[in-house]
């Protein structure tokens, strides 16, 4: 059988067996990691404690490859902490600080100033918008008027009370006017004459008794009109009197009735009152002017009175 001659190249394994030389192991390429000179510490940091001063000295290489010396000085302070904080400081460290002694390590911990946190409890603090002071609305408005000098103060606190007061009374007496006649509202109906009261003990018919000819208060036609022009004042002091309310609300219009709630035992004010005006417009101006006004170290609250259900 004919055979074909050809040149065969011996394999690499046959050559190794013939020569008896062990092949070199194939190893992966080695990558050389260059260490940052700034983080390379030449020597172990030296720690010296002198009283309450702690000094740590260490040597490093900077970016230019030069040897530098770093000295850190700490002041040791002893602070009292709660049990929870002391227990937290004894926790086992982990990571790069696993074998560090107690306390912060300058290599892994940065000690800085304390940061104070402010907790916001409501949305009003976020806006920080200054609300308008209700007292600013009353600036320039003449709420109180003195009867003696027409000044912006109470009559009882008038500096001319002892001089002008007697002169005005004497002049009114000379002109035939009384204080009660001056304070009456214009157009007011005169009060009916009272019937004589029997002092002999004889029987008097109801029609001839005092007030027998007058209608009941609930039958008056203008009672509902008074309810529509009645305001309610609250947060009054205990020393408030009807005369004080008269002086306070008289500048706004003619007043038909004032009711001040009082304690039956002490006679002091209970803190609220009802003022009825002849016109509803005057009552509205009184609410706008006196509501929020400071009186006797208290802030008055004035609102419309609810109509009576009786």
Curated annotation (Swiss-Prot):
Residues 187-196 have a biased composition (Low complexity). Pfam families: eIF3g, RRM_1. SUPFAM superfamilies: RNA-binding domain, RBD. It is found in: Cytoplasm. Coiled coil: none annotated. PROSITE patterns: RRM (PS50102). Its main location: cytoplasm. One of its GO terms (cellular component) is eukaryotic 43S preinitiation complex. Residues 211-229 have a biased composition (Basic and acidic residues). Residues 229-307 form the RRM domain. GO terms for molecular function: RNA binding; translation initiation factor activity. Keywords: Cytoplasm, Initiation factor, Protein biosynthesis, RNA-binding. GO terms for biological process: formation of cytoplasmic translation initiation complex; translational initiation. Residues 1-32, 179-229 are annotated as: Disordered. InterPro entries: eIF3_g, eIF3g_N, eIF3G_RRM, Nucleotide-bd_a/b_plait_sf, RBD_domain_sf, RRM_dom. RNA-binding component of the eukaryotic translation initiation factor 3 (eIF-3) complex, which is involved in protein synthesis of a specialized repertoire of mRNAs and, together with other initiation factors, stimulates binding of mRNA and methionyl-tRNAi to the 40S ribosome. The eIF-3 complex specifically targets and initiates translation of a subset of mRNAs involved in cell proliferation. This subunit can bind 18S rRNA. Component of the eukaryotic translation initiation factor 3 (eIF-3) complex, which is composed of 13 subunits: eif3a, eif3b, eif3c, eif3d, eif3e, eif3f, eif3g, eif3h, eif3i, eif3j, eif3k, eif3l and eif3m. Belongs to the eIF-3 subunit G family. This is Eukaryotic translation initiation factor 3 subunit G.
